[in-house]
Regions:
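Cytochrome P450 I-helix active-site segment
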Residues: 197-204, 269, 334-385, 400, ...
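Hydrophobic, well-ordered secondary-structure elements that form the walls
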Residues: 379, 404-407, 451, 476, ...
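Conserved cytochrome P450 K-helix/beta-meander segment immediately N-terminal to the heme-binding cysteine loop
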Residues: 412-461
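C-terminal helix/juxtamembrane-tail motif
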Residues: 521-533
């Protein structure tokens, strides 16, 4: 095992994501001229060691098969615990965690996604297209910043899915653009960013973004406990926390009051229309079966569990789509040949109607389009939105032949891109050896630095999801349980964007592929120059 000591700024930045980078954060971090897939870092004097594991096959095995040896590191749960102390994210992998996951599993199940999520995500995606079309007209061929568009569209959908009400954020943003178009004087140069009205995000969207930023700051802090305490003392934190609590608690109570008059049979037959209804309905059924009253507000502990899980879903679902969509659009711009190939693949099977009507959401989600699926998979691989997955050893164990004591933080690099070292099979765990054939390869012999969706296609042109591992949503029991929703949303939005716009080249100073770390690795710049189709 290679050992690195001292406060090396480059190493610290690679580990905690505190710098702006062009490449995924931990790419080659553990193998940097050390010829080892496992290194031991001492990030500060007298600190406990941190282990970095940079072998995707072993990372996949640890996440999927060795959860009794590696549980979630307390660093991430601690960052959320002061905000959401009762959500499943902060719980150790065990009976309480699994029970809470089962309680909410209906929200991510196929019936809910098809009946509730599909029409809502389609409407939001069409709203995003209309907003971008209005902005493109106002820009007059100039580039404009689009991350806020993706952000507010993602928030509108996840808010509707979680709480069941419409915030009309996309419609309001478009109306603001339409009202300002005729009175706005644009820069003379077509390469200068257009002057576009700033999107007014809903108050809860601003609150979510604020709390995400505080979590990101605490994760980068040397003294996380002190930093979190300091943030909680700030007036702005207290205001946004009070707003969040009063809003969500009010929605929980109003929904409980509305459903409390239903009988057990009626509650059983009730179709869940949001995550809020799911949580309240199931809690009311539990109270009825336990002989507890349902015509009074939930006990504080019950309300807190519902509240925290709902807000956790809101936070997770909000940023995932915006970041994935941003990177996929940047890859479209940087690779015009891939953009045209994707558009042709879509037009061949999802042509617009004679009157310009869009393909239906059912057609988008059910039609097999191998190149679309390959493009999505390659986008997720290259974006590497979660560049470090942190676990802590719960017992003395081994990784690739190296002894790791109990209680040590282990940083796992999920990036599929660097050439793996040649590691003897006998050094791998038994579960790793047994699962070797789960994927056809762990490395592309032609190299993986370039953006190549074709690497995910079989010789007959079909999409092969087992070509390489994909750890965008982690793996094992702690895999993101919003994965199916995120992939559906990603697909619908990407299809409609490519069918409705050509993403033209940008000036060099607006086309940087540098990233910055918040909750996810996100692009530092997110500009587009659109030609409506």
């Amino acid at each position: 095992m290679a050992i690195v000591g001292g406060m090396n700024p480059k190493i610290s930045d690679a580990v905690w994501g505190t710098s702006v980078t062009r490449q995924p954060r931990l790419e080659n971090a553990s193998k940097m001229k050390l010829n080892s897939p496992v290194i031991q870092l001492f990030l500060a004097p007298f600190s406990n060691p941190t282990i970095i594991t940079d072998d995707v096959r072993e990372v996949k095995d640890i996440l999927s098969n060795r959860t009794h040896e590696f549980d979630r590191s307390p660093r991430t749960p601690d960052a959320y615990r002061s905000l959401l102390p009762h959500c499943s994210l902060v719980k150790a992998t065990g009976p309480a965690f699994k029970q809470q996951r089962r309680f909410w599993e209906g929200v991510t199940g196929t019936p809910f996604l098809r009946r509730v999520a599909e029409p809502k995500m389609y409407r939001c995606a069409l709203g995003l297209i209309d907003l971008l079309r209005a902005q493109a007209k106002m820009a007059g061929g100039r580039p404009f910043y689009c991350f806020d568009d993706f952000d507010v569209a993602a928030f509108e959908l996840i808010w509707e899915l979680v709480f069941g009400t419409n915030v009309d954020a996309i419609k309001n943003a478009r109306n603001k653009v339409l009202c300002a178009t005729s009175d706005t004087v644009q820069p003379p140069s077509l390469d200068s960013p257009a002057r576009i009205p700033v999107i007014q995000k809903p108050d809860m969207c601003e609150a979510v973004s604020f709390f995400i930023s505080t979590v990101a700051k605490s994760l980068k802090s040397v003294s996380q406990t002190w930093h979190l305490w300091y943030l909680r003392q700030q007036p702005v934190y207290k205001r946004k926390l009070a707003f969040k609590n009063s809003t969500i608690d009010g929605l929980i109570e109003s929904t409980r009051s509305e459903l409390a008059g239903l009988s057990e049979g009626q509650l059983m037959e009730l179709k869940e229309s949001s995550a809020l209804v799911t949580g309240v309905r199931r809690q009311l059924l539990a109270h009825i079966r336990q002989g507890q009253p349902v015509d009074v507000p939930f006990p504080a502990s019950v309300r807190a569990e519902i509240h925290d899980e709902l807000f956790m879903i809101l936070v997770a679902g909000h940023e995932t789509k915006a970041v994935l969509l941003s990177w996929s659009v940047k890859f479209l711009i940087a690779n015009p040949d891939k953009q045209e190939k994707l558009r042709k693949a879509l037009i061949d099977v999802l042509p617009k109607g004679s009157n310009g009507e869009q393909p239906s959401v059912k057609a988008i989600l059910s039609t097999s389009i191998p190149y679309l699926e390959a493009y999505m998979e390659e986008s997720m691989r290259a974006a590497n939105t979660s560049p470090r997955l942190v676990r802590r050893t719960t017992t003395d164990t081994q990784v690739l032949g190296y002894s790791i004591p109990k209680g040590v933080s282990v940083l796992l690099n999920p990036y599929i891109g660097t050439q793996p070292l040649d590691i003897p099979e006998h050094l791998r765990s038994e579960t790793s050896r047994n699962s070797k054939g789960n994927f056809e390869s762990y490395w592309d012999v032609s190299g993986m630095d370039d953006f190549q969706p074709e690497r995910w296609l079989a010789e007959d042109g079909s999409f092969n999801p087992r070509q390489f591992p994909c750890l965008t949503f982690s793996a094992g029991p702690r895999m993101c349980y919003g994965r199916n929703l995120a992939l559906m949303e990603f697909r619908v939005n990407l299809v409609l964007l490519v069918l409705n716009f050509k993403f033209d080249s940008l000036p060099k100073d607006l086309a940087s592929m540098e990233s910055q770390q918040r909750r996810f690795r996100m692009p530092r710049q997110c500009y587009v120059r659109l030609s409506p189709l």
